[in-house]
Amino acid sequence: MWIEIPECYEVLRNVFSKFRRHSLTAAMVKLLMRADTHVSFTVPAEEPVAKCTFSQVLAALSVSLGSMVVGFSSAYTSPALVSMKDRNITSFEVTDQSGSWVGGIMPLAGLVGGILGGPLIEYLGRKNTILATATPFIISWLLIACATHVAMVLVGRALSGFSVGVASLSLPVYLGETVQPEVRGTLGLLPTAFGNIGILLCFVAGNYMDWSELAFLGATLPVPFLILMFLIPETPRWYVSRGRDDRARKALQWLRGKKADVDPELKGIIKSHQDAERHASQSAMLDLLKKTNLKPLLISLGLMFFQQLSGINAVIFYTVQIFQDAGSTIDENLCTIIVGVVNFIATFIATLLIDRLGRKMLLYISDIAMIITLMTLGGFFYVKNNGGDVSHIGWLPLASFVIFVLGFSLGFGPIPWLMMGEILPGKIRGSAASVATAFNWSCTFVVTKTFADIIASIGTHGAFWMFGSVCVVGLVFVIMYVPETQGKSLEDIERKMCGRVRRMSSVANIKPLSFNM
């Protein structure tokens, strides 16, 4: 027996059908009304929905504390460079060039960490790889805090960036493999929320501490993360991949609760692994290039591309100028705090909505908000740079900027990382996540380093219009290619994307919710 809730869906379909005589409208309606575009609200009446356990929350919280260290590391240069440049020591002279490398070396090191992180999570395991990043984080911050030369800061930032690259890959994979489908969206966004807490903490502390004191604070953040990681298990799927089914059962029982029947889920994981093994080649890279695996990998790469080419780093870089053009008298450091607060609030909202609206709906909202605000910012700077009077709309850049950050943090900020841990097949999850993470950091470095050249070539207005145009293409990409994964187990997602339904018919009925992809 099935309970149909969204009657409005059928009403909308009937309304839109009246416009089928218009070919363009019909095409757009067909795309927007695709079954995997929206969340289905049909649930089997006889099957109770599993409840989230404290153990899952503890696991998500533990790894998310690592994300707070990542956020703190990413934001460090913004408040720290000012006090670094004020230090009157010849051996510690921070020029504009060396200062740019203090910030720029982290994404480069993150690229290396992203490449090596894939083999690490397959060889060491998801948990042990995350755990292994804590010590390098502490060492990197102590190097920076005790630095007597710029070179020590650069080494510390490089080590921190490497750890960030490894962590940004392994955190979503761990959560994707441990959290049950019904709450995977909410708990899966905890790393992003804690990452934004780390950013906000760095901005606030940077108002009262110099670069060295701020680095000492950074060295303390991995300690609670390190302690809590010892309390949680390795993922059941990694244990199964190593033939340790008994350990997988214990880990799954800990995560789902002592009274939970984990046999159906464990059998599904084992079946999925066996099926993947039958179709695996001797080379991990050859596995990536298989048609069945290439589709989810390309979708993940596409999401990473549109995340960074939305211009988020460019807009953050231009924060102070936007506030100045808005006629704001707010202190520059306070502006960065406002950015951190907006980031955190938006991500918190996303955690409440993602398991209700689904991934794609939040991506739609996010992309449309970014398109409107980027085009608006471009229009403002076009009028301003051509001698137009913008004094009466000095509030517009500030409003656009806040809405842009809100929109990004609702969807395209956290969801590409969340879906990376969901849609990549289990057999290649480590190597594919490594490729996706390295690609993301490459895009980050390119956008950050070329933004000034883009401004010089096509102007500020042209840069914002360019990023807005990329977001338009990104919206089409989401509509046409990105599947809805809300409420589905990883095995269900893999069967749908890789076309292995027939071989796994005995497991196909193990569904906590019923959805159409």
Curated annotation (Swiss-Prot):
Paired cysteines (S-S): none
One GO cellular component, as annotated: plasma membrane
Superkingdom of this protein's organism: Eukaryota
Residues the record marks as carrying a glycan: 88
Ranges facing Cytoplasmic side: 1-56, 122-135, 180-184, 234-296, 355-360, 414-437, 483-517
Membrane disposition: Multi-pass membrane protein
Its biological purpose: High-capacity facilitative transporter for trehalose. Does not transport maltose, sucrose or lactose. Mediates the bidirectional transfer of trehalose. Responsible for the transport of trehalose synthesized in the fat body and the incorporation of trehalose into other tissues that require a carbon source, thereby regulating trehalose levels in the hemolymph.
GO biological process: trehalose transport
Ranges facing Extracellular side: 78-100, 157-158, 206-212, 318-333, 382-392, 459-461
Stated family: Belongs to the major facilitator superfamily. Sugar transporter (TC 2.A.1.1) family. Trehalose transporter subfamily.
Name of the protein in its database record: Facilitated trehalose transporter Tret1
InterPro entries for the chain: MFS_dom, MFS_ERD6/Tret1-like, MFS_sugar_transport-like, MFS_trans_sf, MFS_Trehalose_Transporter, Sugar/inositol_transpt, Sugar_transporter_CS
TM helices/strands, residue ranges: 57-77, 101-121, 136-156, 159-179, 185-205, 213-233, 297-317, 334-354, 361-381, 393-413, 438-458, 462-482
A UniProt-annotated Pfam family: Sugar_tr
Keyword field: Cell membrane, Glycoprotein, Membrane, Sugar transport, Transmembrane, Transmembrane helix, Transport
Subcellular compartments: Cell membrane
GO MF terms held by the record: sugar transmembrane transporter activity; trehalose transmembrane transporter activity
